[in-house]
């Protein structure tokens, strides 16, 4: 192999060395830019994306998988936070209501009612065959035994958002359309699998948008509900058997009013203003005061007068 000839050596501090180094750097930078442009074209043709910071190609499938894993982690965190919210609401047993995830979601279906006044069964990842809703809550009030009751089957579909500044992004629009289809199909399947009965079951689909980092509820959208005549207890048992995890909470009994509640009611109830009763006008010529001498006093006075007269008449002579 022939030996490569070397050029003349020069001092690194000389002007020639500085110019040569600048030329080499410029040529290298131009070559780098050309390579980057060519790599971008090749990656775009193959369905890949160029990462600006790392200057390395990133596969779109890898990004989608990473975002999917982040959504799964957020779902699991939301499930734990929702169960903790129900536990707190039932442990507090406060009749003035409570705040949190449980109260926010139940308010969409049942209105502003205390969470602890309902019999609640919450189920996660319910496998309905065609669909797999994230969460289903069966709510009913404690009514008279043997009488038809009204239950609420709340279907919750969770959508996690990485950025919570704007709700009009393309990804959120796609999530809304996807969630609407999922809720519609889930409600139809539940209506089909419900066992006919005498109870009234309100099927309420709800779409919830949650921020991934702060777990803050960004938006809750309720869609048209359906009312079916079914056996609410059998429907609850069937959905609980199809879920990956289920938890039941019994309605709290009516407790005696504590001193704190009485103080709360006393402070909340406005005090009535006493009515001013006008005093009657004084008569122009007041009557003279009447004597208050009773019958016994009059008899004693008459007896004393008679005894005095008798003593004077029978007075012995001197």
Curated annotation (Swiss-Prot):
It is found in: Host cytoplasm; Host nucleus; Host Golgi apparatus. Keywords: Host cytoplasm, Host G2/M cell cycle arrest by virus, Host Golgi apparatus, Host nucleus, Host-virus interaction, Modulation of host cell cycle by virus. One of its GO terms (biological process) is symbiont-mediated arrest of host cell cycle during G2/M transition. It comes from the Viruses. GO terms for cellular component: host cell Golgi apparatus; host cell nucleus. InterPro entries: Herpes_UL24. Residues 258-293 are annotated as: Disordered. Belongs to the HHV-1 UL24 protein family. May play a role in the dispersal of host nucleolin from the nucleolus throughout the nucleus leading to a decrease in ribosome biogenesis. This is Protein UL24. Residues 271-289 have a biased composition (Pro residues). It comes from Psittacid herpesvirus 1 (isolate Amazon parrot/-/97-0001/1997) (PsHV-1). Pfam families: Herpes_UL24.
């Amino acid at each position: 192999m022939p030996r490569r000839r070397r050029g003349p050596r020069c001092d690194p501090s000389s002007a020639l060395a500085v110019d040569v180094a600048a030329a080499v750097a410029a040529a290298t930078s131009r070559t780098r830019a050309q390579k980057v442009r060519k790599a971008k074209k090749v990656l775009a043709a193959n369905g890949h994306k160029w990462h600006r910071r790392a200057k390395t190609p990133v596969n779109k499938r890898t990004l989608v998988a990473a975002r999917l894993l982040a959504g799964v982690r957020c779902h699991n965190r939301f499930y734990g936070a929702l169960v903790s919210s129900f536990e707190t609401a039932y442990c507090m047993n406060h009749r003035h209501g409570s705040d949190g995830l449980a109260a926010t979601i139940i308010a969409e279906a049942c209105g502003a009612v205390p969470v602890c006044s309902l019999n609640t069964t919450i189920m996660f990842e319910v496998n309905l065959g065609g669909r797999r809703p994230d969460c289903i809550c069966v709510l009913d009030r404690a009514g008279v035994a043997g009488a038809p009751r009204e239950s609420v089957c709340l279907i919750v579909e969770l959508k996690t958002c990485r950025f919570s500044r704007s709700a009009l992004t393309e990804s959120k629009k796609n999530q809304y359309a996807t969630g609407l289809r999922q809720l519609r199909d889930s409600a139809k399947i539940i209506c089909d699998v419900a066992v006919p009965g005498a109870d009234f079951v309100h099927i309420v689909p709800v779409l919830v948008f949650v921020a991934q980092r702060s777990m803050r509820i960004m938006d809750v959208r309720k869609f048209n509900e359906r009312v079916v005549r079914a056996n609410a207890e059998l429907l609850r048992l069937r959905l609980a058997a199809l879920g990956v995890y289920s938890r039941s909470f019994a309605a709290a009994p009516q407790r005696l009013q504590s001193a704190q509640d009485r103080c709360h009611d006393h402070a909340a109830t406005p005090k009535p203003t006493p009515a001013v009763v006008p005093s009657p006008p004084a008569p122009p010529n007041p009557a003279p005061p009447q004597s208050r001498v009773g019958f016994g006093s009059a008899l004693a006075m008459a007896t004393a007068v008679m005894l005095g007269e008798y003593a004077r008449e029978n007075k012995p002579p001197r």
